[in-house]
Amino acid sequence: MKYSPLATALLSSLFITGCTWFGGDDDDAAITPAELVKFKQEVSIKRQWSTSIGSANQDYRNSLRPTVNGDSIFTGDHEGTVTALNISNGKKAWQVNLDVSVSGGVGYGAGMVMVGTIEGEVYALDASDGSVLWTSQVSSEVISSPKSNGEIVAVQTVDDRLFALDATTGEEIWQHDGDAPILSVRGTSESVVTGNMVLSGFDTGKLVAFNPDNGSLIWESRLAVPKGRTELERMVDIDGEPLLVGDVIYAVTYQGRLGALSRGTGRSLWFQDSSSHHAPAYSQEQVYVTEDEDAVRAFKAGSGQPVWINEQLFLRQLTGPARLAGTIAVADAEGYLHLLDPVDGHFVGRVKVDGSGVSAPMLTVGESLIVQANDGSVTAYRLK
């Protein structure tokens, strides 16, 4: 697949300067997003509960996402408020205000809730009551969720560095410099942390597995090779969290490829041309990607063979895909939640979540989907 000069120009404005296509100041110059198509609703979407936890700064809507552990959902907002919600009814179990500008989170691991700040601070909170366990300082702004395996906390920073902090004290154990290029998409990949591996994507298009104890390299794989004469053309960032399914890792780059790799060795199993800054999703033996220009695509997980593409949400600023029961869900900047059939990608359901729009990655919890809107409302949906 090739990406047009138009797409490159549009996306450079969208991701680097933070422009939006809905409600812009210069309506004559704006490129019009796709109108919503009419279709027959095949599923009934039920709102289980909704709770307000605070609003998101426009620059950090993509990086503040909910996370879950057991019967609790943890959320955060840009003003430093971190909230624990009961997963069954959305009621607040606790809420604390850190009085800092939170830019990345929320992460969970080993009984801790973790967030990062604009100033490069990492906060670890007790998941039972929100009390601060420790704080730590890293090199720069944190716009991804810290992750922990109970021994370390992995934190990626906007200058493309990876830090491993002691999970008990917050002290630095090791760090890795991703050697960031001159120009990159604003965003960082979220690490996947297990007992024997820290898996991280970098702005160079490399996916790297580290020993969590000392940071030594286990393997390194390049998903995409920078091409072109300009720095803009050569951007191949990995900004979406790698997806681990059994012994296979799925990851996608901007202006590059979607790939499946062996967890143990990093050996490539298949590649397909693709471009995305979202994490892929997996369901029913297929991998789903929200690509730039907001096409949603499905690939066979085993071979990478393309299955379908839905281009009817062009430039609606979609979230990454998520699973909701037997459907694939994406949300957009106008606040609509769209459900697609995993077999051929046609629309099967739609509901208006909130007029403020949805930017944060959505969270699948069992048969429910947790959606955090830009105005700070957190809502749980399921199919009737």
Where are the regions that the model predicts?
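Extracytoplasmic beta-rich repeat domains
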Residues: 27, 42-65, 94-109, 132-149, ...
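Short coil/turn segments within WD40 beta-propeller repeats
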Residues: 80, 120-121, 160, 205, ...
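Structural signature of WD-repeat beta-propellers
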Residues: 77, 117, 157, 202, ...
